[in-house]
Curated annotation (Swiss-Prot):
It comes from Roseiflexus sp. (strain RS-1). Residues 26-147 form the MTTase N-terminal domain. It is found in: Cytoplasm. The gene is miaB. Keywords: 4Fe-4S, Cytoplasm, Iron, Iron-sulfur, Metal-binding, S-adenosyl-L-methionine, Transferase, tRNA processing. This is tRNA-2-methylthio-N(6)-dimethylallyladenosine synthase. Catalyzes the methylthiolation of N6-(dimethylallyl)adenosine (i(6)A), leading to the formation of 2-methylthio-N6-(dimethylallyl)adenosine (ms(2)i(6)A) at position 37 in tRNAs that read codons beginning with uridine. Monomer. The keyword Iron applies.
Length: 476
């Protein structure tokens, strides 16, 4: 999953903070590094903190309660957290009463004793996703929560799209991944609990829900009756007011015919599937302990595209894993050329302590030099940029439906059913609404267009585009 730094503070909170008289002792600051699961955990914590009377602080020095939600997927993520902790250490010299919590995947089994000696500025260490445990550490609460906090609970303007965790942990044993060591074994949330939470979120104004799990398509196998993700999609799909439904991240081993059929049949379930492949060589997939072959993956992609012709497919790839020869890397390159994904998250291998791949990295006959890792990463990124540009070009002059998430640099920003990012201009407020947009420009990362307010507008703009194309000797 992509490593991102997130500062969790709603825009309206920033705008009104200077007018807010909340004292420092009831202000919090949450800083998050990592995947969307971490982001969701932090959003829930913020909603809970606001529910007991806290207000967000824009800067750590303005808060008495600081929470750093950490990631261990790559070394760079841990380095960011350690850098932030150095900043916090200086702050605590000035404000020794500040309470600091290190939360998330850095705080796994066996790690707390190590970090307690290395990180004296941290008052408490809390395992991933334990929102209630972090909340209990907050000093000076005014209220008590009457029900579990939602990620939109205290926001005047809830986000258009909300991520809902449906499962925690992971039972896989991929050679490179530290997540099972940090988040533990899979635990699925009950179907009724998830549906009720989604219902409450939509009632607060959210329009799109993304169901979230480390291996989201394995949801339910540990629950009574063994429901599956297809069952859950059908249950959430029928919530009144919900416009769109997505899920991530999937594993090829759990992508069943029932799940593919559900995505194909449910109109509000978006044709958007993330299916990490990690490598395009059978020997390397075996080393990685992925549990499938290249041909099985290719067959699965063909099955998905046959059932969902307009599907948008994204994947994850690791380059430089121990044992990746140049020949094996070329297999991954061929796979990307053949399948032509809409988007690929490409990462250079990062050795994580405790994983099988970390031991392999110590073998000089298996390790890939760091410089070579980066060269391979750049090579695939350039290839994928070209593929993405070509795939997005098919939207030129087409009218697409865009769920508008908000404003960005003077333009409205939203996404198509296939999760393509679209920008357009209009004086009206389109936040949370579905817009018909005629695409006038495409690129590898986003699309731009004009609003088609009516059939007359569509005909006028489309006619102009045809005229331009004809003048250039091209077909629309």
């Amino acid at each position: 999953m992509t490593e991102v730094v997130h500062l969790h503070m709603p825009e309206e909170a920033r705008a009104t903070q200077s007018r807010d008289a909340t004292p420092r002792e009831r202000r919090y600051y949450v800083w998050t590094v990592g995947c969307q699961m971490n982001v969701s955990d932090s959003e829930r914590l913020e909603a809970a903190l606001q529910g007991v009377g806290y207000a967000p602080a824009e800067r750590p020095e303005d808060a008495s309660f600081i929470v750093l939600n950490s990631c261990s997927v790559r070394a760079s993520a841990e380095e960011r957290i350690l850098g932030k902790l150095s900043e916090v250490q200086r702050l605590k010299r000035k404000h020794p009463d500040t309470k600091v919590v290190l939360w998330g995947c850095m705080v796994g089994p066996g790690n707390q004793s190590i970090f307690q000696s290395r990180l004296p500025m941290v008052d408490h260490f809390v395992s991933p996703s334990a929102v209630d445990e972090v909340l209990a550490l907050a000093p000076n609460p005014i209220y008590q929560l009457e029900e579990p906090a939602l990620p939109v609970a205290r926001w005047d303007h809830p986000p258009v799209s909300v991520h809902v965790p449906i499962q925690y942990g992971c039972n896989m044993s991929c050679s490179f991944c530290v997540i099972p060591l940090r988040r533990g074994r899979e635990r699925s949330r009950p179907l009724d609990e998830i549906v009720e939470e989604c219902r409450r979120i939509v009632a607060r104004g959210a329009k799109e829900i993304t169901l979230l799990g480390q291996i989201v398509d394995s949801w339910g196998h540990d629950l009574p009756g063994r429901p599956d993700l297809a069952d859950l999609l059908r249950a959430v799909h029928d919530i009144p007011g919900l416009l769109r439904l997505r899920f991530l991240t999937s594993h090829p081993a759990w992508m069943t015919d029932r799940l593919i059929a559900a995505v194909a049949e449910l109109p509000r379930c978006m044709p958007d599937i993330n299916l990490p492949v990690q490598a395009g060589d059978d020997a390397l997939l075996k080393i990685m302990r992925r549990g499938y072959t290249v041909q099985r993956y290719r067959d699965l992609i063909a099955k998905i595209r046959d059932a969902i012709p307009d599907v948008s497919l994204t994947t994850d790839v690791i380059v430089g894993h121990p044992g990746e020869t140049r020949e094996r890397f070329e297999g991954t390159k061929r796979l990307l050329e053949d399948i032509r994904f809409d988007k690929v998250h490409i990462a250079a291998f990062s050795s994580r302590p405790g994983t099988r791949a970390a031991d392999m990295e110590l073998d000089p006959t298996l390790a890939v030099p760091e410089g070579e890792k980066q060269l391979r990463r750049i090579e695939l990124e350039r290839l994928q940029e070209q593929i993405a540009a070509e795939r997005n070009a098919r939207f030129l002059h087409q009218t697409v439906e865009v769920l508008v998430e908000g404003e960005h640099k003077g333009k409205w920003r939203g996404r198509t059913p296939g999760n393509k990012l679209v920008f357009f201009s209009d004086p009206d407020d389109w936040t949370g609404r579905l817009a018909r947009v005629i695409i006038t420009h495409t690129g590898p990362w986003s699309l731009q267009g004009v609003l088609a307010r009516s059939d007359e507008t569509f005909a006028r703009v489309n006619g102009a585009l045809h005229a331009v194309a004809a003048a250039n000797g091209a077909a629309v």
